[in-house]
Swiss-Prot record:
One Pfam family, short name: His_biosynth
Subcellular location: Cytoplasm
Name this protein carries in UniProt: 1-(5-phosphoribosyl)-5-[(5-phosphoribosylamino)methylideneamino] imidazole-4-carboxamide isomerase
Pathway it works in: Amino-acid biosynthesis; L-histidine biosynthesis; L-histidine from 5-phospho-alpha-D-ribose 1-diphosphate: step 4/9
Any one of the GO BP annotations: L-tryptophan biosynthetic process
Leader sequence segment: none
Organism: Debaryomyces hansenii (strain ATCC 36239 / CBS 767 / BCRC 21394 / JCM 1990 / NBRC 0083 / IGC 2968)
Keywords recorded for this protein, A-Z: Amino-acid biosynthesis, Cytoplasm, Histidine biosynthesis, Isomerase
Taxonomic classification: Eukaryota, Fungi, Dikarya, Ascomycota, Saccharomycotina
Domain of life from the UniProt record: Eukaryota
Catalytic reaction annotation: 1-(5-phospho-beta-D-ribosyl)-5-[(5-phospho-beta-D-ribosylamino)methylideneamino]imidazole-4-carboxamide = 5-[(5-phospho-1-deoxy-D-ribulos-1-ylimino)methylamino]-1-(5-phospho-beta-D-ribosyl)imidazole-4-carboxamide
A GO MF term: 1-(5-phosphoribosyl)-5-[(5-phosphoribosylamino)methylideneamino]imidazole-4-carboxamide isomerase activity
Family to which the UniProt record says this protein belongs: Belongs to the HisA/HisF family.
GO CC, any one term: cytoplasm
EC number(s) reported in the record: 5.3.1.16
Gene this chain is encoded by: HIS6
Length: 276
């Protein structure tokens, strides 16, 4: 059954909502005050506030994403996990060296891996199956989420979704498909998929991608694919439910009132989950 999932995006140590396509620089201390990233919302509240908000509302499976290598992002993510230990999924800069620390020390429920899973090849960035298998064995399949966020590519009137890494700026050689998702699913517990072209714009979800994710959903992964990007109405949950045959979950960002948005009320999403 489709459900609402929560997110906590962290940039420069603060909870923010940004336009995904503008995240072209690493978030370092030096760039804090001259970033080119377009911000929709910058919270005055700590990450722990949002962790407790989701906890008290019973919104499970929420993710915390560190947008850049700024050490302040690590501290904010740790604070969120301390507020709801063993319940939040953490991504952004996670690799084979620090994954266990986030799980066992900082008490994330899952780690979300993206860019580290890709290696250089003669043709560009290629999904590294050796790395995937290694980290899956290290942390356990049940604690690993693979982020396969993507950008839309049109070739001869055919729509394809190419997996994007490096803050969604670098296109890889891998495209989303039933076969690809099926193979990756053998080593992880969930997928997180941002539609990078519509992320943060509040102009509507990528309905074609949502439908395909429902079609391509591996057996046993119903309710384990989280789509993010463009949600602007509570009715988007109904749309995702219908298009994906209840196999895909939906997260909201810039449209949500708790992130300064004016289109969607958090309480309405909580009620939707309770009713369904």
């Amino acid at each position: 059954m489709t459900k609402f999932r929560g997110c906590i995006d962290i940039h420069s140590g603060q909870v923010k909502q940004i336009v995904g396509g503008t995240l072209t620089q690493d978030d370092t201390t030096e760039l804090n005050h001259k970033s080119t990233t377009t911000e929709n919302f910058v919270s005055t509240k700590p990450s722990s506030y949002y962790a407790e908000l989701y906890k008290n509302a019973g919104i499970n499976g929420c993710h915390v994403i560190k947008l850049g290598s700024n050490p302040e992002n690590d501290e904010a993510a740790k604070l969120a996990c301390q507020s709801w230990p063993n319940n939040l999924q953490v991504g952004g800069g996670i690799n084979g060296d620090n994954a266990l620390e986030w799980l066992d020390v900082h008490k994330a429920s899952h780690v979300i891996l993206t860019s580290w899973l890709f290696s250089d090849s003669d043709e560009g960035k290629e999904f590294d199956w050796v790395k995937l298998k290694r980290v899956s064995e290290l942390v356990g399949k049940s604690r690993l989420i693979v982020d396969l966020s993507c950008r839309e590519l049109r070739v001869d009137d055919k729509i394809e979704w190419v997996v994007a890494m490096n803050k969604w700026q670098t296109l890889t050689n891998n495209k989303l498909s039933a076969e690809f998702l099926g193979e990756v699913s053998q080593y992880c517990d969930e997928f997180l998929i941002h539609a990078a072209d519509v992320e943060g714009l509040c102009n509507g979800i990528d309905v074609n991608l949502v439908a395909k994710l429902g079609e391509w959903c591996p057996e046993g992964f119903e309710g384990k694919i989280v789509y993010a990007g463009g949600a602007r109405s509570v009715k988007d949950l109904d749309t995702v439910s219908k298009l994906s045959d209840d196999k895909v979950d939906l997260t909201y960002g810039s449209a949500l009132d708790v992130f300064g948005g004016k289109l969607v009320k958090f309480d309405d999403l909580v009620s939707w989950n309770e009713l369904h």
